[in-house]
């Protein structure tokens, strides 16, 4: 068996300082994202669970854009809503499909007359 000598990484003081600064910046970004999530969940009365919650959130988006007097950047404000809206839409699409264990094909379980749904599998 071949053994290798242990390797050491030698960093200058500037390298260490740069790494520490990067780590602190990442921690701050993570904390900011956590605080944003808490803020928007509190503002919307909790996390989104259904399509009715999604509709309520879209109303909140319009209200917040009309009277946004605080210093929060509107792009950051909207990106959080867009993430939630995309999540709800994705969940709705997944809930409308189920995987058949017999034939391993997807079949839509609801809204069979939706001609614009790209995920709708039409049986021939």
Swiss-Prot record:
Signal peptide: none annotated. One of its GO terms (biological process) is anaphase-promoting complex-dependent catabolic process. Residues 40-87, 99-124 are annotated as: Disordered. Pathway: Protein modification; protein ubiquitination. The modification Phosphoserine is found at residue 12. It comes from the Eukaryota. Residues 47-59, 99-116 have a biased composition (Polar residues). It is found in: Nucleus. One of its GO terms (cellular component) is anaphase-promoting complex. Pfam families: ANAPC_CDC26. Keywords: Cell cycle, Cell division, Mitosis, Nucleus, Phosphoprotein, Ubl conjugation pathway. InterPro entries: APC_suCDC26 (IPR018860). Residues 64-78 have a biased composition (Acidic residues). The APC/C is composed of at least 13 subunits that stay tightly associated throughout the cell cycle: APC1, APC2, APC4, APC5, APC9, APC11, CDC16, CDC23, CDC26, CDC27, DOC1, MND2 and SWM1. CDC26 is required to tether the essential subunits APC9, CDC27 and CDC16 to the complex. Belongs to the CDC26 family. Component of the anaphase promoting complex/cyclosome (APC/C), a cell cycle-regulated E3 ubiquitin-protein ligase complex that controls progression through mitosis and the G1 phase of the cell cycle. The APC/C is thought to confer substrate specificity and, in the presence of ubiquitin-conjugating E2 enzymes, it catalyzes the formation of protein-ubiquitin conjugates that are subsequently degraded by the 26S proteasome. This is Anaphase-promoting complex subunit CDC26. It comes from Saccharomyces cerevisiae (strain ATCC 204508 / S288c).
């Amino acid at each position: 068996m071949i053994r290798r000598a242990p390797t050491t990484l030698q960093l200058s003081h500037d390298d260490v300082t740069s790494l520490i600064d990067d780590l602190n910046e990442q921690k701050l970004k993570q904390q900011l994202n956590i605080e944003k999530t808490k803020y928007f969940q509190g503002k919307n009365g909790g996390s989104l669970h259904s399509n009715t919650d999604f509709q309520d959130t879209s109303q909140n988006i319009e209200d917040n854009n009309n009277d946004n007097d605080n210093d929060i950047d509107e792009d950051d404000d909207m990106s959080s809503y867009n993430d939630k809206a995309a999540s709800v839409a994705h969940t709705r699409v997944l809930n409308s499909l189920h995987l058949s264990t017999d034939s391993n094909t997807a079949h839509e379980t609801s809204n069979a007359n939706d001609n614009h749904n790209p995920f709708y599998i039409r049986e021939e």
